Amino acid sequence: MVHAAVLLVATACLAVFGVMLIMNKRRHIAQWTYLMIPLTLAEGLLSLALQGLGVNLIGPAIQLVVLIALHVTADPSLREERRLQFALRRMDARSAYEDAASQGMAGRDLTGKGYISLDFFNLFWLFAIGCVFGLVIETIYHFILFGEYQDRAGFLWGPFSPIYGFGVVIVTVLLNHLWQSNWLLIFCSSAVIGGAFEYFTSWFMQAAFGIRAWDYTGQWLSIDGRTSGKYMFFWGVLGLVWVKLILPRLLRLIQRIPWKIRYSLTLVCFILIFVDGVMTLMALDAWYSRMAGVAQNSPVSQFFATYFNDDFMAHRFQTMKIDPSTAGRM
């Protein structure tokens, strides 16, 4: 039902978008891409959850690439921004950065509307650091609570828990304009955002791969066992501490990455984490297929069965319990 609704909305928006392309309304085209890109991402995630990894994702992937290309090329202000950025790189990009750094404004939103500049460089490093420190905090919390160490990583390789990385990015983006607001508003907003994100993540993992990584059934304000009042409270506290205390200090730390290597280092790290994420999704899909009794005849499935077999997956993802019968695939 949800997938059908998203497809219906996306199709209607795509029709309007096509008319705008024909009429060459560049400014409106650029604005509509802000709506179409999230819809396309939602369509792709729902398709992955309900049908798994396959040719069903080719359409959303191509559409996403086209939308991003149109977004960048259709908006005259973005073209002007690219020209300006190119000129700055040629003339005085470094001096401009050093000037901003000397005023304590490196990485900041210079418009004053938000605290942090929501550019790729900042958001990527917030994601990466959130993945690592989120894993550390959760591991310590589990050890204190149960007196045992448990590997709570969410990627095939590295000390990464992507739910915290994405959580950090989502909270940062949605609360960026509230950084000067009172603590109660930030706390409540973060609690709702975190709870909704946790619910969706739990639903997606179960629908796509039959995996439950947590179950809060029986807790206060439990919603299908996917989130609860207790953990929404934790999200609220973490969001408040993040916006008021951690983000300003972390931004200053990120901006200390040397100018000469910051973009090359970011690109290399992004590629490594992106490959890690894609391989993780493929390994989870192969794990689901094996547990569901699907024949592993393709070279790809045989590769994952050899190098990322059931024992490896169970040991690596110790918090995950897989039951293909609970998946929502069609």
Locations of regions flagged by a protein language model:
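Aromatic-rich, lipid-facing transmembrane alpha helices and their immediate juxtamembrane interface loops
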Residues: 2-330
